[in-house]
Amino acid sequence: MKNNIQKGFYLVLSVAVVLLLISFIPKFKIGNKEFKRVDLLSDLKVSDGGDIDNPDGTDSTFVDDGGGTVVTDSASVVEPEKELVTVQLGQLTPNGTIRIEDYGPMERNGLNGFVWSLKQIGLKKNVRIAYYGDSFIEGDILTGSLRDLLRERFGGKGVGYVDITSQVSGFRVTVKHKYGNWNSFAATERSGFDASKQGIAARYFTNAGNAFVELKGSKNGVALDRADKSTIYFVSRSNAVIASSINGEPQEKHQIEGSESLQHITVEGDIESIRWSVLSAPNAIFYGVTMDGTEGVVLDNLSMRSSSGYHLKGIPEQRLQEFNKARHYDLIVLEYGLNVAGKNQKNYSTYKKNMIATIEHLKSAFPNTSFMLVSVSDRDYRASDGQMHTMPGVKALVEAQREIAQECGIAFWDLYTAMGGDGSMAAMAKKGMANKDYTHINSKGGKKIAELFYDAIMYEVER
């Protein structure tokens, strides 16, 4: 009897050892059949909860496995399965550019959705990007060059979304913008501003009598001289009449029924110029007009001078949700910090709290959109050694912004390091790429940074 018990014990032990060894065999294929790894201890293992709080600063991203999911032009996209890949901080692309850190690989708001959309652009009508920022990008500096690079690879037409009126229309070269007879309101200009009325760019405009806005294509960029369609976005609570004129042709009148929700009119054609005129629109609120292609990349510059980025939290979520349906974005980029960084400031806890709330507000309204936080750029001062160095507060802010991206589960790109780190803005100024305030870049500098950003994006697309 004792001998039988021993035999039984050794048999069970042998089977257990064999099964345990099987769990170490990696997945393999025989013909077209794939055999996956079996982990017999998986139910006993405790998950570490992801990489967001990993003390060594690593993050993770996914690469698609070549699945054949068909992507349509809608806010809900079914993505293929992804494999987890760890990215170390400071890792470079083959061209030497700082890579994008993705802290949301297992969330819908990580970079994967945008990367997948670019890969499937032939099956998708448009891939849209909203690029929010402060004066660092106003006038389409940086964003204009990034749009050009993406257009050369993925196609597209037109300048995208333009506010009804603009502070930068006099020096923006990517579109010719005329307007008249409007009352303008912005989140950073408190006088008379009603936060409940603002739109996607934290602005709104009302008719002061026979108002009009006109966009004309530009040759200062890739495929900016014409578009396939133009849209005007507004809310008119009572019936209204709005007219459109393509390329100076006779007006077409559009009869609008009153509604509390976001409305839009779209006209199509070979559009070199578009003029929208308000014939009758009592109490209507207007937001912006577009020149877009029917295919390829659309990049909207949504800059707000003197902003920290907090103002975006004030945009009503319902209005954002309506824009998500009418003009869904595959990627929303947030680049702020010039108006936050203090020379010697080290504690950015209040900023972090406010910015996290802002990003979560946007994520709630755009649940199927990828988000990326771009760090503050270098900002220099003359130190005690007589040389130009980065303000200490900038370095602390970059780390705070990385922590924001980690907590929000979105992508992060370290622009400060990518452009060269300490003293890099002064170095760019010496090369004629930045202003002597050692804070703002010019169009030449914008082109350089756009090339770096494009390289970082394309590495994620191609790997």
Regions found by a protein language model. Give the residues of each.
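Hydrophobic membrane-insertion alpha-helices, especially the h-region
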Residues: 9-27
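Conserved, compact domain cores that house catalytic/ligand-binding motifs in diverse enzymes
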Residues: 125-133, 138, 142, 296-386, ...
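Conserved SGNH/GDSL esterase-like catalytic core that processes O-acyl groups on lipids
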Residues: 138-245, 255-353, 440
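Short N-terminal or domain-adjacent regulatory/targeting segments
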Residues: 98-121, 201-218, 250-255
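Juxtamembrane proline-rich low-complexity "stalk" or linker regions positioned immediately after a signal peptide
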Residues: 29-87
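Catalytic His-Asp segment of secreted/periplasmic serine-dependent ester chemistry enzymes
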Residues: 31, 316-317, 378-463
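Long, contiguous interaction/targeting segments characteristic
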Residues: 67, 71-175, 442-443
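Short, Lys/Arg-rich N-terminal segment immediately upstream of the first membrane anchor
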Residues: 1-6
